[in-house]
Amino acid sequence: MNRLKKGDDVIVIAGKDKGRRGVVKSFAKGGSLVLVEGINIVKKHIKPNPNRGIEGGVVEKELPVDASNVAIFNPATEKADRVGYKFVDEKKVRYFKSNGELVDL
């Protein structure tokens, strides 16, 4: 179960961008892939197509990373953290497991 949401500040815990931080932009493949702003940037070679008005060249593009390779970033501890759920005032909220602070304020 993926406990991330769009707009969460995450840190990459595995892969070529390990240690870098970014914000979750979207999810793909039912939540198993996460598109993170500024992470997993690759260069794509685009073929020109004058009929569509596409100019050819090399374009940098963000690709999604597996959700298991990112963790939510806890600003209080400055480290990656895990997320749990609990009820506060009959409302389900997320909290950081290391210090118990709420993620959703």
From Swiss-Prot:
Gene: rplX
GO BP annotation list: translation
Known function: One of two assembly initiator proteins, it binds directly to the 5'-end of the 23S rRNA, where it nucleates assembly of the 50S subunit. One of the proteins that surrounds the polypeptide exit tunnel on the outside of the subunit.
Molecular function GO terms recorded: rRNA binding; structural constituent of ribosome
Species the sequence originates in: Francisella tularensis subsp. holarctica (strain LVS)
Name the UniProt record assigns to this protein: Large ribosomal subunit protein uL24
Disulphide linkage map: none
NCBIfam families linked: rplX_bact
InterPro entries xref list: KOW (IPR005824), Rib_uL2_dom2 (IPR014722), Ribosomal_uL24 (IPR003256), Ribosomal_uL24_CS (IPR005825), Ribosomal_uL24_KOW (IPR041988), Translation_prot_SH3-like_sf (IPR008991)
Family of the protein in this entry: Belongs to the universal ribosomal protein uL24 family.
